[in-house]
Amino acid sequence: YPDALMQFEQTYPGARVLLMEENYRSTPEILRAADAFIRKNHHRRPKTIHPTRASGAAVRVIYAMDRADQYPWLVNMAASVQEETAVLYRNNDSALPLIDLLDRGGIPYRCRRMDDAFFTHRIVADIRDIIALAHDQTDAEVFLRIYYKVGGGISKKAAEYACQKSRATGGSILRELLGFPQLSQYGRDSAAALLTMLPMLLQDTAAQGLSRIWDGLRYRDYAERQKLDGGKYEILCLLARQETGLEGLCRRLDELQALVSAPSLPCGGGLILSTVHSSKGLEYDTVYLLDVLDGILPAVTEPKNAGQQDQYQEERRLFYVAVTRARNRLYLFACRNRESAFADELRRELPREYIGPEDVFASLNTEPCGKHYRHAEKGGGVIRACCRGQCMVAYASGETEFLTLGQMVDRRAVAWRAPDRPAPAALPREQAALPPSGVRPGQRAVHRVFGPGTVLSFRDPIVEIRFPAKGDKKFVLSDSVQRGLLRLEE
């Protein structure tokens, strides 16, 4: 594609090349960032994009703790969207957790019909098979599909033997497997681990169960050996956050597959979900860029050969397309625990607000993402995402709330602490003893706090003293004297 443009004059001698350098779509703020990004591409004609529109809103970065925090932010935006707004992403997989939340919340959106490639992918199918085997350990068809993918040391002969014995006895295939005479110790350990962990999957939450399959049953090892797309597992984990168990997750996968494969997806409202490829040639008032993360967009971050270099340059052009779909407003996420080469590069091209050291906002000009916040009624929480004075707070109860900084100040829990006061000086040690003549009414006394007074009475161990400024007080005489609080005069 670039070669055809770069070699146009050689292909068509005498041809005239016209550069389209005026942009009528986007604001100068969006074009300035986009042009600075694409200028770093190799193998392109030197040109500069000139905006024709007046200045508009600044490009905004939404800071988030991790990938999962993008989705509730977008759902909150979608609930009140009033103009045509597009969420653009590289792969359809990225949209599934968002579609799940929008559907649960009854929020309208528009989206092209998707294929069901995610739902039929080997990782998704294998994990569902493992869940099915946990429910029915006599299912020979499922067992023969997955026995060599979890653990190891189980031969095909051993697996078929166990299935045959199970059909005859009606017992667990795994228990019958342990009776295979030629089963190695490694295979025996794998079968025992499956026997132990499969029932646990039925008690786990959906998130715990996926983790147990991936790491506990070592399905991750198989997926990596086969070079399968681990991103499918990550999407499953994002979907699992909304489910209490693996059975519910499987039901929801069936529902989502039917939803995205339907001839016409839900429509209405101003929210549009689209891949970047499908958005070419289109434009939207506002654009949110989802999953601009290394390994997704760009898929290749450190090209090692000419083929990967060409792919990387094409990824940069695709990101440029995504950025320039926005007419008026552009938002992109920056996730703290995920690298994003493209988002970081674009951010470096954005103008930075200057705040002088004496400005009242200087103390607020720090990134609050990840900070703790305590609400007066809802208790402690963590700021999971933020953008330009708006914060997404996740509380320990599981509730997520969107607050401005002003609202956070008004609603925060305040802990009060008494001021520190220096302890009164103790009486000199030589004065901290009872007088040799004992204690008698009318005797003069000096208290470290209440000052001078007169003894009214003494009934061991209690002495009662009258202080002109404080009235009558009673003390345990020996304790007060030993601590240096009270001195009796002769």
Residue ranges and their predicted role:
Residues 180-278, 282-286, 296-299, 327-333, ...:
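Accessory C-terminal helicase-associated subdomains
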Residues 38-47, 170-171, 206, 244-248:
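Proline-centered turn/helix-capping motifs that create local helix->coil transitions or kinks
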Residues 402-414, 478-488:
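Structured surface patches comprising rigid loops and adjacent beta-strands/short helices at the edges
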Residues 1-3, 23-27, 56, 67, ...:
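Conserved nucleotide-binding/hydrolysis micro-motifs of P-loop NTPases
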Residues 2, 13-108, 132-136:
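Helicase P-loop NTPase motor core
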Residues 12, 55-56, 79-207, 220-224:
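ATPase/helicase motor core of nucleic-acid motors
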Residues 286, 292-399, 403-405, 413-460, ...:
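C-terminal accessory regions
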